[in-house]
């Protein structure tokens, strides 16, 4: 799902990072480390003006697509009524236009942290993934083509970036047991 549900009143927010399926447990381990590395950088350094502008421009152009069907228009109209706000597109676009990089960085500092982060991995070899995570096994990235030295150097740091997941907190579930 790439769009939030319409007509569903929210009382709290969730922050999630999703990683696409990868070739192997090593790649999944590396990608998870990369996500945490980048999240830690974002929390420490905030967002740059350039990244902020690019993201805000993307979102301003994306918001109208969220109400592309009559079904979603009705759902978001009900949401606007529930929250007592302007129509969805008008409300969100006006807020995005007024938003500043300082606002975003303040909210990042006040609200994002990785102390109680939770991970879910879906893999064909859960025991291997469990071992990798518990032992903080290195997860070097291997490319099919030559990459710039700067990227390779950063990848070496990321390959050993600590996820710090206590072994006692790592549980492997068989797929047929997940929804019991």
Model-based region annotation:
Residues 1-101, 114-123, 130-137, 180:
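M16 family metallopeptidases and their MPP-like homologs
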Residues 91-180:
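Proteolytic maturation boundary segments
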């Amino acid at each position: 799902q790439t769009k939030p549900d319409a007509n569903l009143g929210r009382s709290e927010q969730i922050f999630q990072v999703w990683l696409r399926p990868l070739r192997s447990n090593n790649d999944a381990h590396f990608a998870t480390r990369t996500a945490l590395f980048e999240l830690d950088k974002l929390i420490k350094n905030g967002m740059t003006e350039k990244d902020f502008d690019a993201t805000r421009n993307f979102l301003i152009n994306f918001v109208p697509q969220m109400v592309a069907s009559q079904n979603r228009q009705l759902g978001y109209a009900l949401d606007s009524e529930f929250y007592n706000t302007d129509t969805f597109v008008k409300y969100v676009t006006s807020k995005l236009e007024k938003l500043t990089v300082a606002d975003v960085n303040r909210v990042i500092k006040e609200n994002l942290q990785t102390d109680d982060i939770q991970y879910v991995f879906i893999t064909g070899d859960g025991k291997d993934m469990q071992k990798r995570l518990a032992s903080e096994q290195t997860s070097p990235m291997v490319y099919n083509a030559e990459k710039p030295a700067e990227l390779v150097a950063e990848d070496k740091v990321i390959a050993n970036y600590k996820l710090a997941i206590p072994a006692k907190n790592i549980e492997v579930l068989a797929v047929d047991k997940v929804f019991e």
